[in-house]
Every structure is written in structure tokens, then in C-alpha cells.
Swiss-Prot record:
Keywords: ATP-binding, DNA-binding, Metal-binding, Nucleotide-binding, Repressor, Transcription, Transcription regulation, Zinc, Zinc-finger. A zinc finger (unnamed) spans 3-34. Negatively regulates transcription of bacterial ribonucleotide reductase nrd genes and operons by binding to NrdR-boxes. This is Transcriptional repressor NrdR. Residues 1-11 have a biased composition (Polar residues). Belongs to the NrdR family. Its cofactor is Zn(2+). Residues 1-22 are annotated as: Disordered. GO terms for biological process: negative regulation of DNA-templated transcription.
Length: 155
């Protein structure tokens, strides 16, 4: 591995441990030439995953889009950036564990809603209001009532 400091190819691994929910290996290395220490990550190369959008077009899976959407839904809520990242990790893991090459944006949206329902009620409703494209107040209220019933807060 090339040292980022002196650009020599002689380095040794001084520590190695699982990372990213066992999907990567974090290695701490030391350059044998200059003694500089640096970290590398080894990950499994995954097949590209395509998202089928509502209009039928396909685009590469982009976790940043999901992160942006949940952060917008959770704006000014007591949700940390680590919690947002963890939510997106869970969604991506659900998708990738299926071993498929394509998935609909609707299915991804449902996974996001499932995760948000457990994290924050307000963020869930905000996300649902965009994702589900409510046509009227009664369909919006039905979603709220369903969520409250699942959480044991309603009726």
C-alpha cells in the first residue's frame, strides 16, 4: 500500500478490525520508510444496483439521495447525524441483502418510512406527506391514525 506521506510502497499492518457492520475491514498501517501511520478500509465490491423510478427510468442507487430526504424530513427534530446515517445504512442493507440488481423507488421509500416510524413520528409524517403524495386531508389523516395505532397511541 502506498504511503500518503512519502509515496513509498512499503507499509505494514499494525491493527486490523471489522468495521461498518462487518461489511469492511479497517486496517491501521505504518510506512516502513517514514513511519507515517494511516488507515485503510477494505470492502467487498458490490454489483451496481439500479433504482426504477416512478416514470420507469433507471438510475444508480444513491444513498446520498436517501440521506438528503430523511434529513429534510427530520429538520429541526432531535435526530443526530449518526442516527440519519444509521437509518440509511439499515435501508441500504435491506436492499442489498435481497441480492437483486434493480429495485423500485417505491420499495425504497417504504423501507425509509418503516425506519422513520421507529425513529421519529414527526419526521415520518413529513416524509410520508411527500412520498405518498396525499390527494386530500382524509388520506393524510388515515396515515396518521394508522401510525398512531401501530405505536399504541391511538383509539
Amino acid at each position: 500500500m502506498e504511503c500518503p506521506n512519502c509515496h513509498q510502497n512499503a507499509s505494514r499492518v499494525i491493527d486490523s478490525r471489522p468495521s461498518d457492520e462487518n461489511r469492511a475491514i479497517r486496517r491501521r498501517r505504518e510506512c516502513e520508510n517514514c513511519g507515517f501511520r494511516f488507515t485503510t478500509f477494505e470492502r467487498i465490491e458490490t454489483a451496481p444496483l439500479l433504482v426504477i423510478k416512478n416514470d420507469g427510468t433507471r438510475e444508480p442507487f444513491n444513498r446520498k439521495k436517501i440521506l438528503h430526504g430523511v434529513m429534510a424530513a427530520g429538520q429541526k427534530r432531535p435526530i443526530s447525524s449518526d442516527q440519519f446515517e444509521q437509518l440509511v445504512d439499515h435501508v441500504e442493507n435491506k436492499v442489498r441483502k435481497q441480492g437483486i440488481s434493480e429495485i423500485s423507488s417505491k420499495k425504497i421509500g417504504q423501507y425509509v418510512m418503516d425506519e422513520l416510524a421507529d425513529l421519529d413520528d414527526v419526521a415520518y409524517i413529513r416524509f410520508a406527506s411527500i412520498y405518498r403524495e396525499f390527494k386530500d386531508m382524509s388520506s393524510f389523516m388515515k396515515t396518521m391514525e394508522d401510525m398512531m395505532a401501530k405505536k399504541g397511541k391511538g383509539n
